[in-house]
């Protein structure tokens, strides 16, 4: 079973579990690092999550995963916050974080570049609009966004 398939199945299991606890499932990753496999589940909620939130989801998800036992290898389950540089995955994320500093990478160059950093000004059918510098707006089409995340403001 491919890593993306495993992550997808775990996401289907974890999303309702997180929502019952008032949490948002941000992302699920199944990766191999240094010869070990990790199943990473990232959660959030307004105001941020705490250790008790992570522990509760980890405990329930671990039991559920043991019951269905579809992951063919041993792995380490990690449940945590997405951190300050949280990924932006869904259209709702762009609405929620309007006004924040973001970093967006594209699949192909747009106006000669593939990396954009700026203030998230909005989103719509055509894509995401960010303010680059003081006066330059850039609209990045949805289908060109390969990776987007919040950026830390100092």
Curated annotation (Swiss-Prot):
What are the alphabetically sorted keywords of the record? Cytoplasm, Ribosome biogenesis
Localization recorded for this chain is: Cytoplasm
Please give the GO cellular component terms listed in this UniProt entry: cytosol
> One GO biological process from the UniProt record?
ribosomal small subunit assembly
- Database matches in Pfam families: DUF150_C, RimP_N
Q: Which domain of life is it from?
A: Bacteria
Q: What is its main location?
A: cytoplasm
Query: What protein family does this chain belong to?
Result: Belongs to the RimP family.
Described function? Required for maturation of 30S ribosomal subunits.
Q: What is this protein called?
A: Ribosome maturation factor RimP
Q: Gene that codes for this?
A: rimP
């Amino acid at each position: 079973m491919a890593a993306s398939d495993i992550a997808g199945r775990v996401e289907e299991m974890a999303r309702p579990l997180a929502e019952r606890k008032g949490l948002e499932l941000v992302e699920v990753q199944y990766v191999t690092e240094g010869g070990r496999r990790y199943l990473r589940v990232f959660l959030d909620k307004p105001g941020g999550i705490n250790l008790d939130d992570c522990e509760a989801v980890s405990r329930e998800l671990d039991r559920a995963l043991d019951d269905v036992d579809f992951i063919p290898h041993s792995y380490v389950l990690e449940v945590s916050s997405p951190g300050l540089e949280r990924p932006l995955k869904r259209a709702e994320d762009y609405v929620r974080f309007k006004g924040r500093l973001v970093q967006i990478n594209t699949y192909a160059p747009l106006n000669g570049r593939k990396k954009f950093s700026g203030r998230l000004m909005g989103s719509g059918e055509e894509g995401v609009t960010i303010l680059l510098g003081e006066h330059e707006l850039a609209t990045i089409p949805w289908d060109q966004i390969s990776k987007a995340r919040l950026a830390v403001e100092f």
